[in-house]
């Protein structure tokens, strides 16, 4: 059985960890970094870039560089959040798919589902793990924000499938961080608040860590959050300030210039990071734009105090979910023994200060906020594989689940913060006399009004025998698995007839869609391999051309004019072949040059051997002088003395 890897699929950055013996280890990517930007770019040549390579070219390719895709995953195009929060903040096209989902499109018109784009990041993680382990990797534990709904969880699972990974478990990010902390902690019973402010989402979880019969039991008491609050919003606040200041100075609005916008976005992110350790920074972007009077440069000084004033409302927004999580857990601030900070944005001093003020205690800073979640995912992978024995994880469902009943009301079957896996049944009846069928409308959310909650799906239970209203007994059962994914069934108790729905398609992708995307991903992998092989063939050819010409130069007159001409001709033909994309043609011309150069190589080798022989002969003559010979005693060492 292969390793089950742990992946933190983040909005801004992603991280990979595996179990190495009894400890979890973060694995560096091919570029030598422990985190990988969650950025995917499609180039004009058809190449797919992932991570740092994609991020580097974002300024020159804003329409085809996709970042913060996690904010779109599992969402409908008409969602208020998509229309107000995302479409206005990204340079790439967000479109409405045939099924109503929010998809993205390249400038060439290629349409893609968010799980398809996220799958490229997961594929890079999978490849990194395979390169490190030297064996195929097919199974993973992937983390999601605790406040992700059913659609978003299912869409994340779909992304894994498209990337060629069987997702063994979807685990909540704060829970994963607590797992990483809890496995290392030997302090006995603790109640921990995990404050997780990442690139795109915010979660707060109240978690109890206890020793139960020698097992480390990690039980989530409550969770809350905001799926539209994260580091991207902090970047955006600073970016808008820089653009407004530039407009005041120069009278030019950069909001409509995609290239300039991307440069300012990157500069804002860099300045934000610098202001976590420095009191002020200079944002300097020469030649940001131009008008009739000539080129314009952006040069603005930003102090930490100014930045904090721009984002203070964002930090305060994170405290309301903290209050709700404490209320749901039935605890007060004084009951919290430790506060863990997770997510890169928690490095900001203002965030640390406000968290300290709220909980009344210094948050722990000994965990790496970028890596803790991936480490926890790897530990959960170890638990599932049977490699980690003494850990028991009890997670919760973040939002209430129920069905629509008479009058457009949502009747909850499973309340939020219920420990999962769980199963709950309730009996309902018909609203009219002789009603032949009932529609079960499955909802997720906290509102009383059904239409205000998230619709997960509908199905019908038909062929109900004629009866007065209120007489038929329809038993509805909700069953949530350990991934937080829901199965719903309805049964007519009189006839035993049953109908069920696995809320699979709540991600918006059918099995056929996913299968097609898996095939596309495999085709891309094949294309990537062909591209890699072509580059290898070109490099081999370039090296051979260089070494052949160098040898001809060094041998000088020892090579005949005819031989020189033959080799130069072969070099030119090979150079011409390397400018094309035909690998076989390059290899054929490489072989032709090797054959043409072989006699010269033999001649050079023979000369070297002759020179070495002459030198060796001269040295062999020397010892005829009187030599100092040193006698040495030696002793046989028998086996039993070894």
Curated annotation (Swiss-Prot):
Keywords from the UniProt entry: ATP-binding, Chaperone, Nucleotide-binding, Phosphoprotein, Stress response
Annotated signal peptide: none
Residue numbers spanned by region Disordered: 609-642
Molecular functions per Gene Ontology: ATP binding; ATP-dependent protein folding chaperone; unfolded protein binding
A Pfam family that the UniProt record links to this protein: HSP70
InterPro entries in alphabetical order: ATPase_NBD, Chaperone_DnaK, Heat_shock_70_CS, HSP70_C_sf, HSP70_peptide-bd_sf, Hsp_70_fam
CDD domains membership: ASKHA_NBD_HSP70_DnaK-like (cd10234)
Bias kind Acidic residues: ranges: 628-642
UniProt induction comment: By stress conditions e.g. heat shock.
Protein task: Acts as a chaperone.
HAMAP family recorded: DnaK
Name of this protein: Chaperone protein DnaK
Organism: Francisella tularensis subsp. mediasiatica (strain FSC147)
């Amino acid at each position: 059985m292969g390793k089950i890897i742990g992946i933190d699929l983040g909005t801004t950055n992603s991280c990979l960890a595996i179990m190495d013996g009894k400890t979890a280890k973060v694995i560096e990517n091919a570029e030598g970094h422990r985190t990988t930007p969650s950025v995917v770019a499609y180039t004009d040549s058809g190449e797919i870039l992932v991570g740092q390579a994609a991020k580097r070219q974002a300024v020159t390719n804003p329409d085809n560089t996709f970042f913060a895709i996690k904010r779109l995953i599992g969402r409908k195009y008409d969602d208020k959040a998509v229309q107000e929060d995302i479409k206005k903040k990204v340079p790439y096209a967000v479109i409405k798919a045939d099924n109503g989902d929010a998809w993205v499109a390249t400038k060439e018109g290629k349409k893609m589902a968010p799980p398809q784009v996220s799958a490229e990041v997961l594929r890079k993680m999978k490849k990194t793990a395979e390169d490190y382990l030297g064996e195929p990797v097919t199974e993973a534990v992937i983390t999601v924000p605790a406040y992700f709904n059913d659609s978003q969880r299912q869409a994340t699972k779909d992304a894994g499938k498209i990337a060629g990974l069987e997702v063994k478990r979807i685990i909540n990010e704060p829970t994963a961080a607590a797992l990483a902390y809890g496995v290392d902690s030997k302090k006995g019973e603790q109640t921990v608040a995990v404050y997780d402010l990442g690139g795109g989402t915010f979660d707060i979880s109240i978690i109890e860590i206890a020793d139960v019969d020698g097992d480390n039991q990690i039980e989530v008491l409550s969770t809350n959050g905001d799926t539209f609050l994260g580091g991207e919003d902090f970047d955006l606040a600073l970016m808008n300030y820089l653009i407004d200041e530039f407009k005041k100075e120069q009278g030019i609005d950069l909001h409509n210039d995609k290239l300039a916008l991307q440069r300012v976005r990157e500069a804002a992110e860099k300045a934000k990071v610098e202001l976590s350790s420095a009191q002020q920074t200079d944002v300097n972007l020469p030649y940001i734009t131009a008008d009739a009077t000539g080129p314009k440069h952006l040069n603005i000084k930003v102090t930490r105090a100014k930045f904090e004033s721009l984002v203070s409302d964002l930090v305060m927004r994170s405290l309301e979910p903290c209050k709700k999580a404490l209320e749901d857990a039935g605890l007060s601030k004084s009951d919290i023994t430790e506060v863990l900070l997770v997510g890169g944005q928690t490095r900001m001093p203002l965030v640390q200060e406000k968290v300290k003020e709220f909980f009344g205690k210094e948050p722990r800073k000994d965990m790496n906020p970028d890596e803790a979640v991936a480490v926890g995912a790897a530990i959960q992978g170890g638990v599932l594989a049977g490699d980690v024995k003494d850990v028991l994880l009890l997670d919760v469902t973040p939002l209430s689940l129920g069905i629509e009943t008479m009058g457009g009301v949502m009747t909850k079957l499973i309340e939020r913060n219920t420990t999962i896996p769980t199963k709950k049944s309730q009996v309902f009846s018909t609203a009219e006399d002789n009603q032949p069928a009932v529609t079960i409308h499955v909802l997720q959310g906290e509102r009383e009004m059904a239409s205000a909650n998230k619709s997960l799906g509908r199905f019908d239970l038909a062929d109900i025998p004629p009866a007065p209203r209120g007489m038929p007994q329809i038993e509805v059962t909700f069953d949530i698995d350990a991934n937080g994914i829901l199965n719903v069934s309805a049964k007519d108790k009189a006839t035993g007839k049953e109908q069920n729905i696995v809320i699979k398609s709540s991600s918006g992708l059918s099995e056929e869609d996913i299968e097609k995307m898996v095939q596309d991903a495999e085709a891309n992998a094949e294309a990537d391999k062909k591209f890699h092989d072509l580059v290898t063939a070109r490099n081999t050819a370039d090296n051979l051309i260089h070494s052949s010409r160098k040898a001809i130069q060094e041998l000088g007159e020892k090579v005949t004019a005819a031989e020189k001409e033959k080799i130069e001709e072969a070099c030119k033909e090979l150079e011409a072949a390397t400018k094309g994309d035909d690998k076989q043609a390059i290899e054929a011309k490489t072989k032709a040059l090797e054959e043409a150069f072989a006699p010269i190589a033999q001649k050079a080798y023979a000369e070297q051997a002759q020179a070495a022989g002459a030198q060796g002969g001269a040295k062999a003559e020397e010892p005829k002088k009187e030599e100092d010979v040193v006698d040495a005693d030696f002793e046989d060492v028998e086996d039993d003395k070894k």
